[in-house]
Amino acid sequence: IRCSQEDRVWTLWDKEHRTHYGYSLDTGEKLWGPSEPEAQLGIFETWSIFYDGKLYTHGTKGIIDCYNAKTGEKLWSYKASDPFNEILWSDNWNIRIDFIAAGKIYMRHSEHSPVNPLPRGAPYICLNATTGEEVWRIDGAFRGTDWGGRGYIGDSILVKCNTYDMYIYAITKGPSALTVAAPDIGVPAGSSVTLKGSVTDISPGTKEYAVQARFPNGVPAVSDNSQGE
């Protein structure tokens, strides 16, 4: 059961049929439901959260389903695909919502009783909460846990424990450095010139030995197209 004070709605999850129902928080009257059955693996673990007039469901099914909280209309779905079949029982990663902030959904992979060695390449995903469009996805950066804390965000800094190495990471926009190399010989007027250079990330974390060993020439900066406000 989940309740939304803002929408004056509470919802009920029918595990056996994998469907949702919506009821008035004021009168108890049934408003909508049942929804269309969700993916089969949802029978094991399905959670839900309200945000901005919408109900989001997530869990073992590896799919985020979004509904209108007041009418039950299904608005969109997002599949956290696992193209290399690291998960033994699904084509999707188990996916959990860490938090929703500023119109974006931040999601982790975690699992109740993980198999060791842990599946490789677990994604951390950011979605547009209105459209379900993928804002960014980082495969292998962070793996969450069902038993520890979720990720958190404040001052545009996302803090997350990574259960691959048990380090706590903080990610945000950081400083960068630009290098440009021009021809060191004279060029006739009107001739074309090729400038070469690089843009590197110079955030504090890039100075750690493990990072420097992997990127001896500097960590490439994230492109503008791969970032969002």
PLM regions with names:
Residues 1-229:
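Secretory-pathway ectodomains
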